[in-house]
Swiss-Prot record:
Belongs to the universal ribosomal protein uL22 family. This protein binds specifically to 23S rRNA; its binding is stimulated by other ribosomal proteins, e.g. L4, L17, and L20. It is important during the early stages of 50S assembly. It makes multiple contacts with different domains of the 23S rRNA in the assembled 50S subunit and ribosome. The globular domain of the protein is located near the polypeptide exit tunnel on the outside of the subunit, while an extended beta-hairpin is found that lines the wall of the exit tunnel in the center of the 70S ribosome. The lineage of its organism: Bacteria, Bacillati, Bacillota, Bacilli, Bacillales. PROSITE patterns: RIBOSOMAL_L22 (PS00464). One of its GO terms (molecular function) is rRNA binding. This is Large ribosomal subunit protein uL22. PANTHER family: CHLOROPLAST 50S RIBOSOMAL PROTEIN L22-RELATED, LARGE RIBOSOMAL SUBUNIT PROTEIN UL22M. It comes from Anoxybacillus flavithermus (strain DSM 21510 / WK1). InterPro entries: Ribosomal_uL22, Ribosomal_uL22_bac/chlpt-type, Ribosomal_uL22_bac/org-type, Ribosomal_uL22_CS, Ribosomal_uL22_sf. One of its GO terms (biological process) is translation. Signal peptide: none annotated. Keywords: Ribonucleoprotein, Ribosomal protein, RNA-binding, rRNA-binding. The gene is rplV.
Length: 113
Protein backbone atom coordinates (compact mmCIF):
# COMPACT_ATOMS: atom_id res chain seq x y z
CA UNK A 1 0.00 0.00 0.00
CA UNK A 2 1.22 3.49 -0.82
CA UNK A 3 0.43 6.86 0.72
CA UNK A 4 0.95 10.06 -1.22
CA UNK A 5 1.21 13.79 -0.52
CA UNK A 6 1.37 16.59 -3.09
CA UNK A 7 2.18 20.28 -2.66
CA UNK A 8 1.04 22.19 -5.72
CA UNK A 9 2.15 25.60 -7.03
CA UNK A 10 4.93 26.04 -4.46
CA UNK A 11 6.97 29.20 -5.11
CA UNK A 12 10.36 27.57 -5.64
CA UNK A 13 12.05 26.75 -8.94
CA UNK A 14 11.75 23.04 -9.86
CA UNK A 15 15.47 22.86 -10.63
CA UNK A 16 16.32 23.96 -7.07
CA UNK A 17 13.73 21.65 -5.49
CA UNK A 18 15.05 18.64 -7.45
CA UNK A 19 18.49 19.08 -5.86
CA UNK A 20 16.94 18.41 -2.45
CA UNK A 21 14.38 15.77 -3.49
CA UNK A 22 17.17 13.64 -5.00
CA UNK A 23 18.75 13.35 -1.54
CA UNK A 24 15.76 11.58 0.06
CA UNK A 25 14.53 9.24 -2.70
CA UNK A 26 14.68 5.60 -1.52
CA UNK A 27 15.54 6.48 2.09
CA UNK A 28 13.69 5.55 5.27
CA UNK A 29 11.42 8.34 6.51
CA UNK A 30 13.40 9.00 9.71
CA UNK A 31 16.64 9.26 7.73
CA UNK A 32 14.99 11.48 5.10
CA UNK A 33 13.74 13.92 7.78
CA UNK A 34 17.25 14.08 9.29
CA UNK A 35 18.75 14.80 5.85
CA UNK A 36 16.21 17.57 5.17
CA UNK A 37 16.79 19.19 8.58
CA UNK A 38 20.53 19.46 7.87
CA UNK A 39 20.34 20.58 4.24
CA UNK A 40 20.76 24.37 3.98
CA UNK A 41 18.49 24.90 0.97
CA UNK A 42 15.26 26.91 0.71
CA UNK A 43 13.41 23.82 -0.59
CA UNK A 44 14.25 21.70 2.49
CA UNK A 45 11.49 22.91 4.87
CA UNK A 46 8.89 22.75 2.08
CA UNK A 47 9.83 19.17 1.16
CA UNK A 48 9.95 18.19 4.85
CA UNK A 49 6.38 19.44 5.25
CA UNK A 50 5.22 17.36 2.25
CA UNK A 51 7.05 14.30 3.62
CA UNK A 52 5.37 14.70 7.03
CA UNK A 53 2.02 14.98 5.27
CA UNK A 54 2.67 11.73 3.37
CA UNK A 55 3.60 9.99 6.65
CA UNK A 56 0.45 11.32 8.33
CA UNK A 57 -1.65 10.10 5.38
CA UNK A 58 -0.04 6.65 5.63
CA UNK A 59 -0.70 6.45 9.36
CA UNK A 60 -4.23 7.86 9.37
CA UNK A 61 -5.71 6.60 6.09
CA UNK A 62 -3.97 3.22 5.70
CA UNK A 63 -2.91 2.26 9.28
CA UNK A 64 0.73 1.79 8.25
CA UNK A 65 3.61 1.48 10.72
CA UNK A 66 5.52 4.79 10.65
CA UNK A 67 8.82 3.09 11.57
CA UNK A 68 8.72 0.89 8.44
CA UNK A 69 7.96 3.65 5.92
CA UNK A 70 10.30 4.28 2.99
CA UNK A 71 10.22 7.10 0.41
CA UNK A 72 9.44 5.07 -2.73
CA UNK A 73 8.77 7.98 -5.10
CA UNK A 74 9.79 11.62 -4.85
CA UNK A 75 9.61 13.96 -7.79
CA UNK A 76 9.14 17.61 -8.71
CA UNK A 77 7.14 18.78 -11.72
CA UNK A 78 6.94 22.28 -13.10
CA UNK A 79 3.94 24.35 -12.06
CA UNK A 80 2.58 27.51 -13.68
CA UNK A 81 5.13 30.26 -14.26
CA UNK A 82 4.45 33.79 -13.00
CA UNK A 83 5.68 36.26 -15.60
CA UNK A 84 7.05 39.57 -14.33
CA UNK A 85 8.98 42.44 -15.91
CA UNK A 86 12.11 44.20 -14.69
CA UNK A 87 12.58 47.76 -15.95
CA UNK A 88 15.89 48.30 -17.77
CA UNK A 89 17.74 51.24 -19.26
CA UNK A 90 16.43 53.24 -22.24
CA UNK A 91 12.79 52.41 -21.46
CA UNK A 92 13.21 48.72 -22.11
CA UNK A 93 12.03 45.83 -19.94
CA UNK A 94 13.34 42.30 -19.33
CA UNK A 95 11.16 39.31 -18.59
CA UNK A 96 11.48 37.62 -15.20
CA UNK A 97 10.01 34.12 -14.88
CA UNK A 98 9.03 33.24 -11.32
CA UNK A 99 8.80 29.47 -11.52
CA UNK A 100 6.61 27.26 -9.34
CA UNK A 101 6.76 23.55 -8.53
CA UNK A 102 4.44 20.63 -7.88
CA UNK A 103 6.18 18.42 -5.27
CA UNK A 104 5.01 14.80 -4.91
CA UNK A 105 6.20 12.27 -2.31
CA UNK A 106 4.98 8.66 -2.11
CA UNK A 107 5.77 6.47 0.90
CA UNK A 108 5.17 2.76 1.42
CA UNK A 109 6.01 0.12 4.01
CA UNK A 110 9.33 -1.65 3.60
CA UNK A 111 9.03 -5.37 2.89
CA UNK A 112 10.29 -7.73 5.62
CA UNK A 113 13.51 -9.59 4.85
Amino acid sequence: MQAKAVARTVRIAPRKARLVIDLIRGKQVSEAVAILRHTPKAASPIIEKVLKSAVANAEHNYDMDVNKLVVTEAYVNEGPTLKRFRPRAQGRASAINKRTSHITIVVSEKKEG
